[in-house]
Amino acid sequence: MSARRSANFVNTSVTTHELVEFEVPAGIAIGQAMRELNLPNKGDDAIVCAKDTEGQLKDLSHVPEETATFTAVPANSEDGRAVIRHSCAHVLAQAVQAEFPGTKLGIGPAIENGFYYDFDVAEPFTPEDLKTIEKRMKKIIKTGQKFERRVYESTEAAAAELADEPYKLELIQDKGNVDPDSDEATEVGAGELTAYDNVNPRTNEVEWSDLCRGPHIPTTRYIPAFALTRSSAAYWRGDQTNAGLQRIYGTAWESKEKLDEYQTMLAEAEKRDHRRLGTELDLFSFPDEIGSGLPVFHPNGAIVRLEMEEHSRRRHIQAGYSFVNTPHATKSDLFEKSGHLGFYKEGMFPPLQLDAEYDAEGNQTKPGQDYYLKPMNCPMHNLIFDSRGRSYRELPLRLFEFGTVYRYEKSGVVHGLTRARGFTQDDAHIYCTEDQLEEELTSVLEFIISLLKDYGLDDFYLELSTKDPKKFVGDDEIWERSTEILQRVATNSGLDLVPDPEGAAFYGPKISVQAKDAIGRTWQMSTVQLDFNLPERFELEYTSPDGSKQRPIMIHRALFGSIERFFGVLLEHYAGAFPAWLAPHQVVGIPVAEDFIPHLEKVVDKLRARGFRAEVDTSDDRMQKKIRTHTTGKIPFMLLAGGRDVEADAVSFRFLDGTQVNGVPVDEAVELISTWILERNNTQPSEETIAALR
């Protein structure tokens, strides 16, 4: 091959394959250019596809019509894993149709940490079925089937080929109307209508095909490690009025080691599942009589929640926020004005028809009107701002509420406390001038990080969502200036910043605070959202120093997301063992024998006098049984007392890790516990940590 048509590195200073840029001459496949440059095709960093200058992923078989620059996408990158997982979903579907003839295909996208595929099948899948399917998948992968892209000549040609696949036919008919961010876009997004054929490398015969946009890995041998994780019921396109399907979930990684790490994390996550811990620790429940996604907090859970809210309330008052309260329901006119009925009606509960009047004969004399349970608090906060004239001297005005909202989440996505239908937001709306914006955003972000650290989270990064040029309101210049300010504030925080291009809502850019928990999972915690839309819709104004009327800038800020969700996150983060300041039961006295109960009751009385949650276990259980019970109950301080303790006016500490400190004088024990709780120490006390305080 001549030098003119050879591939070239564009960036030769890189040290990881994830950042390698290379030039591909016209008429040459990306994979061929990659081989010329000796980029890896095996191992964790094997190149599985490439990204063009517009951010579009391309198969390695793609041949550019003109010389073009691409970025190599290795298996161990997020994009690389997503492509491997989507290809593994195809292998899953091929295996299911081989093992269960007559199965109809839904969709099979890559998702976070894995993939799924939906099937219309006669009977629900069993655990044994998953083993059989997994075995068939391994055989398919071993053959090294090639993924080959094929463009349909027409919609009619695609429909003819897929005549026996009703769900695929529906997608074909909907092409052009599919939300580009939906799972369905995996199959029929923008551009040509295409299929991917799984081709036997020995016979060159097509073994199986699927409607798909791609891209895909070159062959099934690029799937080194996968596992099917579970199956569940699902609805076609997530709509409960549509056909019921069976969904199989799986995960795939660039190496067996990474798969093992993930499965270990999953096992640990299962132990920490807040739904299970909520039952075991008697914290909350979801009674069928009340309905899906509507939690009930029991006394233990209510104590934790109260402590969470009270600490947050104190911090907000110190930071200059004004507390407000708003009702749970409102006339539909308010949400018409705010735009929520136009944009979010599907996510709202159905309206309540109220205020109609009737005469004695039952004839309606006055029509009723629609009321809605509120999905958001911001429209009501705007009414508070607009309830009287505002001066620039009042700004920034920070309104805060623990406001309960209701959102009609589909039953398939409701998940314990972390995805509920009724929940309470720690919701703030800040009204400020443009000159105050940067200082206020800096203050808000610092406050968020500081408060989250108070609860024991300490590993954060930020995500900046910027304007979608096809979907926004407001002036371009304001968007650009505000985005620059957000970026500067985020950068100055010292936290890692991840871009989310075109990810902003239509009304303004935002920063999201992402936090990692004790086992390395990432949770989106807080959002700081600018809004150029609602101040216009509500015609909000303040009087400026020159007497003119000006629009304030509005900042939406939910720190926890919701109390319920944050409760679930903390419950899993601490595996149920809440820090002593949050724990529903902080101290329990355990007598060696019944005779020592009065001694422990005196100790408990001293602790209660200081406002701590303490009690003596006076049950008939033996001491060792009591220790096991309260260890399982995650009580941070267990105080034991026997004859020597009574004689010395002392107690012995027992901790959740099994360590013990004996013979601590009662007054000293009370001070140690008091210091530990009042300082809001987020670690569990132990022999070592208590010794350090003495």
UniProtKB/Swiss-Prot annotation:
Region (Catalytic): 273-579
Gene Ontology CC: cytoplasm
Gene field: thrS
Main location group: cytoplasm
Subunit structure, as described in the record: Homodimer.
Stated family: Belongs to the class-II aminoacyl-tRNA synthetase family.
GO molecular function, one term: ATP binding
Name recorded for this polypeptide: Threonine--tRNA ligase
Cofactor(s), names only, from the UniProt record: Zn(2+)
Keyword Cytoplasm: yes
Keywords: Aminoacyl-tRNA synthetase, ATP-binding, Cytoplasm, Ligase, Metal-binding, Nucleotide-binding, Protein biosynthesis, RNA-binding, tRNA-binding, Zinc
Cellular localization per UniProt: Cytoplasm
EC number per UniProt: 6.1.1.3
